[in-house]
């Protein structure tokens, strides 16, 4: 059989185009996850050192600088290691830093014992003057579940922002499969009301294998392979199942008990499916190493946020994440109480800007989980 040159070129073009798209998407995700890093490095001339970048990061994180870090920033402003176009902003932040560390941060909060302990530990770690009350009237309430709290300055909770990011991306284009468990049935039913064109599948620990194989038509593919094999008992056919072609993306509304089994199960059949979830799918995991089960799952949270969780001593990842969110709340309180507005600051969730009277936007970005990159980073 002769294969035409046109056919070969067509295949090559498709292959190269696919590789280019994958590379482009990967670079976009990397750039999105390094906004804070680029924000800092863009202000420094190439001759500058790592210590300067670290000191500048701490300045924009509203963290307390030691004398050595302050002196380094002042000297770098004079000798040109910091770009002239950023000098005024950095000088302004040095004044903000001095004010933050000479004034008392005042907090009046109503919340659970768990959150009280985290807040006090975070404030002690900040090494600043503070006054915190949990009993006075007119307190600001933080839900026991920090993920479900808007934390005073946000219009939405962290989990609401994640869900909105996922739904805006996934529900408006081609048909997708939404896999949910009984814990998230209410949310799945709410999605069905306005998004009935998508496929929905309820699963549990014991039935997910059969249900997923049926809806993705994996069983049909295996049955055809067995039929072909039956014609020649002596032949051994290597078979890779062909999945439904109209479902390329799966959105999970499940917890860790289901997720740690379901995601690896699907990946064992194909790498072509794009898998999405909020961070809830691994909240109950013990450590970042457990994310190996979720390799290449796309989540609407930056790699940097996830990597920071390894440094916190809590029983599971949810506790680590909640601690990071409360740290962000404290930093925004610092900004408000010291009139730091209309300037970019670096939070655990990423680069953001505080505008007086306006909701703070976390500017979430997607990350395809890569366990090696966060273990190396942490």
Enumerate the predicted regions with their spans:
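Extracytosolic ligand-binding ectodomains
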Residues: 2-10, 19-378
